Design a protein with these regions (language model features):
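Alpha-helical metal-binding/catalytic segments enriched in His/Glu/Asp
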Residues: 1-30, 79-83, 94-114, 191, ...
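Acidic/histidine-rich catalytic neighborhood of metal-dependent amide-processing enzymes
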Residues: 1-69
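Sec-exported extracytoplasmic/periplasmic mature domains
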Residues: 2-9, 42, 108-115, 209, ...
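Acidic-enriched catalytic cores of C-N bond-cleaving enzymes acting on peptides and small amides
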Residues: 42-49, 55-64, 70-78, 90-174, ...
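Short beta-alpha connecting loops at secondary-structure transitions
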Residues: 65-67, 88-91, 226-227, 293-305
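Zn-dependent metallopeptidase/amidohydrolase metal-coordination segment
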Residues: 82, 252-322
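Active-site-adjacent substrate-binding region
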Residues: 107-115, 128, 135-145, 233-283
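C-terminal substrate/ligand-recognition segments
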Residues: 178-214, 231-246, 267
Length: 324
C-alpha cells in the first residue's frame, strides 16, 4: 500500500499494468480471497509477475551473507483424523475402549514418524548459504546422515531445516469428550501436513499409513485442504531485477532461491502460469534464525528498517523491471 501510494503520487506512467491486490484471508487458506478471485476474475488479474510475502530474509554465516528469496512453497495436505471408541462410565476405565487413549497413540506415532528426506537443488543452495563447517555440510547433503546433522544445528535453524527437507506432520487441534465422567467414544485430530514437491493425496495417505501402522485402518481420514507444492523458475527478468535491487542494500550478499515451509497466495498465481516470488527485504537485525523464532510466535514483528528496505526494494523493481 505504501509503495502504490508513492507510485500514484509521482504520476509516472509505466509500459505495463501494475496491480495492487489485497485480500484478508491468506491465514485461512486463501479459499475465499486469492483462490476464488484468481479462478473467477483472471481477466482482471492476469499477470506475468507476482511479488508477495515471505522473502528477502538475510542469513549470516562465517562464509558471508545470503538473502533468501522464496521461489517455491511446500504443499498443504491438512487432514482431520477421527478415532472411535465405546462410551462408558469414567469410574470404570479398566479395559475400556477409550477413544482419547487411542487418539493419544495416534498423536505419538505421528510425532515419532521419520519420513525419508527429499534433497534437491533448493536444499543444496540453502545448505551452502548456511556456511556450515565442511563436515556438517556434507552430512546435511546426505539423506542417511541428515537427521543427526539437523540435531547439531542451532535451535533457531534446525526446525526450518527439517521442514525444508521433509514432509511434516503437526497435530495441532484435538477435540472430544462430553463430560468428566464419560469415556469418550469419538475424538478428532486436525493435522497440519506440509508436503514436498511431487507429493499428492496418494503420497499423504501412504505417509499416514506408514506412520500409524496397525492403527491406520481404525482411523477415519478426511481431507480438510489440499494444495500441491508450487515453484517458479529463476531464469527471467524479474529474478534479475530483484537480485540487482537487493544488491543495493546487501552489496556482497548472494541471492538464494528458497522454499518456504508455509503457504502463501503465490501458489494460486503459479497455478495460472505466473512467476511468483516471496520478496521483501529484512534488515540485518532480522536474520533467518530470528525471523523463524518470531513467526506465529509471541513476538511476531519486523523492525522499521525492514519496512523501509522492503518499500525501497519494491520501488526499485517497479522502476527497473521493464525492458529498455
Amino acid at each position: 500500500a505504501v509503495v502504490f501510494r508513492h507510485l500514484v503520487a509521482t504520476g509516472k506512467h509505466y509500459p505495463g499494468d501494475i496491480v495492487y491486490f489485497a485480500v484478508a484471508d491468506e491465514e485461512a487458506g486463501g479459499t475465499h480471497g486469492a483462490e476464488i478471485l484468481v479462478r473467477d476474475e483472471w481477466d482482471a488479474l492476469n499477470c506475468q509477475w507476482v511479488l508477495t510475502e515471505f522473502g528477502g530474509i538475510p542469513m549470516h554465516s562465517p562464509a558471508g551473507t545470503s538473502v533468501l528469496v522464496t521461489t517455491a512453497e511446500k504443499g498443504l495436505g491438512w487432514r482431520r483424523l477421527t478415532v472411535k471408541g465405546t462410551p462408558g462410565h469414567g469410574s470404570r476405565p479398566y479395559g475400556a475402549d477409550n477413544a482419547l487413549i487411542k487418539a493419544a497413540e495416534v498423536v505419538r506415532r505421528l510425532s515419532a514418524y521419520r519420513p525419508t528426506p527429499q534433497l534437491d537443488e533448493l536444499w543444496a543452495a540453502r545448505v551452502k548459504a548456511m556456511g556450515l563447517p565442511d563436515e556438517l555440510s556434507r552430512k546435511m547433503l546426505d539423506p542417511a546422515a541428515l537427521h543427526d546433522a539437523i540435531a547439531e544445528l542451532p535451535a533457531e535453524l534446525a526446525g526450518n531445516a527439517h521442514a525444508c527437507s521433509h514432509t511434516t506432520f503437526s497435530p495441532n487441534v484435538i477435540g472430544g469428550g462430553v463430560k468428566t465422567n464419560v469415556i469418550p467414544d469419538s475424538v478428532t485430530i486436525e493435522v497440519d501436513i506440509r508436503t514436498l514437491p511431487g507429493e499428492d493425496n496418494e503420497e499423504v495417505d501412504a505417509h499416514l499409513r506408514a506412520a500409524l501402522g496397525d492403527l491406520y485402518d481404525a482411523v477415519e481420514t478426511e481431507v480438510i485442504k489440499h494444495d500441491p507444492s508450487t515453484a517458479s523458475a529463476t531464469d527471467n527478468r524479474l529474478w534479475e531485477t530483484l537480485s540487482a535491487s537487493i544488491a543495493k542494500a546487501y552489496p556482497e550478499a548472494l541471492v538464494v532461491p528458497s522454499m518456504v515451509t508455509g503457504g502463501t497466495d503465490a501458489r494460486f498465481f503459479r497455478n495460472q502460469g505466473s512467476v511468483a516470488y516471496g520478496a521483501g527485504l529484512l534488515s540485518h537485525r532480522v536474520d533467518a534464525g530470528e525471523f523463524a523464532r518470531r513467526f506465529h510466535g509471541h513476538d511476531e514483528r519486523i523492525d522499521v528498517d525492514s519496512l523501509r528496505l522492503t518499500v525501497q526494494l519494491w520501488l526499485d523493481v517497479v522502476e527497473n523491471l521493464w525492458d529498455n
